[in-house]
């Protein structure tokens, strides 16, 4: 038995091979023709991971590229939108290149809004998307404040105060009594 590796073939192509056997006195072409077809390149296979750490304006999501389709992954990341089935024409956060797991930080999101997100991967054959996930950012609400009873009461003054239990998701801009 013998074998030879043929390099530089084109994907998704049919090839025909005939073998030649030779020794130092003669050579003989084998009449039998073998046929084979090379595997076609495909777009990558990518899965969208679960969305985590959702706040009023941020979230973390990513994906896993499980198959590169026979070619180098040149870009990967997530696409997101407030409408279903986001594509690269919507919001995009890139996370480098290559096969494997990755994460992306989504920032500057609107509070109390539902977003749809999908992981994506790009190779020379094209772009593929993972399954769609959705999440809703936390809504900004009115702060929750408690007031304490007045202390140190005199004829002309008293000490009063309170505690902010929940800022409602927004940065405190003012406080007072």
Where are these regions (language model features)?
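Short, surface-exposed linear motifs at loops/turns and structural transition points
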Residues: 1-177
């Amino acid at each position: 038995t013998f074998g030879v590796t043929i390099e530089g073939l084109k994907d998704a192509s049919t090839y025909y091979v005939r073998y030649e056997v030779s020794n130092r006195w003669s050579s003989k072409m084998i009449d039998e023709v073998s046929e084979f077809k090379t595997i076609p390149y495909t777009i990558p296979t990518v899965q969208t991971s679960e969305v985590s750490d959702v706040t009023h304006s941020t979230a973390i999501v990513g994906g896993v590229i499980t198959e590169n389709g026979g070619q180098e992954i040149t870009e990967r990341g997530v696409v997101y939108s407030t409408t279903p089935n986001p594509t690269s024409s919507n919001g995009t956060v890139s996370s480098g290149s290559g096969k494997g797991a990755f994460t992306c930080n989504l920032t500057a999101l609107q509070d109390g809004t539902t977003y749809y997100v999908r992981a994506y991967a790009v190779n020379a054959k094209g772009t593929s998307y993972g399954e769609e996930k959705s999440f809703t950012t936390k809504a900004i609400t009115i702060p929750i404040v408690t007031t304490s009873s007045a202390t140190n009461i005199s004829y002309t003054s008293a000490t009063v105060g309170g505690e902010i239990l929940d800022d409602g998701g927004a940065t405190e801009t003012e406080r007072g009594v």
